[in-house]
């Protein structure tokens, strides 16, 4: 009681552009504890570790903390053996982790979004040296989320945006 445990549901450290497939242990642990010892009021707290330069030793890191997840949300009983219950909790965990991390379908798209963020900073006359990692993250997160929504709903518009950013880069 009144303690925390840390679980990294990706199961490994990586430098990929997006979240890896999550392991189900966090859901099974939470549901199992509630089932055997509950009700405990357990919460799963998504935490994002967002590095300034993943490949650089001792680069800056922003630790983003998401909204606590109730593994029993809308359900009276926990069942750690139920695939449906585990998948439901894992869906919430994945959504929570994605809300506090940057996720790009590819490194090319990551570079595009980072370039768009730099153009935004320049247009707003923001000095990247003075911007906090939290400010940089917020801008990139908003751009990445908007990019992914637009890519899904209007791929032609995304193609035009990519061409415009690439055209601007060619002019430089």
Model-identified regions with their sequence ranges:
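Non-catalytic C-terminal accessory region of glycerolipid acyltransferases
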Residues: 1-172
């Amino acid at each position: 009681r009144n303690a925390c445990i840390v679980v990294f549901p990706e199961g490994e450290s990586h430098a990929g552009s997006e979240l890896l497939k999550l392991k189900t242990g966090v859901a099974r642990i939470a549901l199992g504890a509630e089932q055997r010892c509950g009700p405990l009021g357990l919460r799963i707290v998504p935490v994002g570790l967002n590095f300034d330069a993943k490949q650089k030793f001792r680069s800056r890191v922003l630790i983003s903390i998401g909204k606590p997840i109730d593994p029993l949300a809308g359900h009276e009983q926990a069942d750690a053996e139920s695939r449906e219950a585990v998948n439901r909790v894992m869906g919430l965990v994945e959504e929570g982790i994605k809300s506090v991390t940057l996720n790009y379908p590819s490194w090319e798209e990551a570079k595009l979004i980072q370039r768009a963020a730099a153009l935004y900073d320049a247009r707003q006359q923001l000095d990247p040296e003075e911007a906090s990692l939290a400010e940089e993250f917020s801008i990139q997160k908003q751009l990445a989320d908007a990019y992914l929504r637009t890519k899904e709903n209007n791929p032609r518009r995304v193609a035009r945006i990519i061409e415009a950013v690439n055209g601007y880069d060619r002019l430089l």
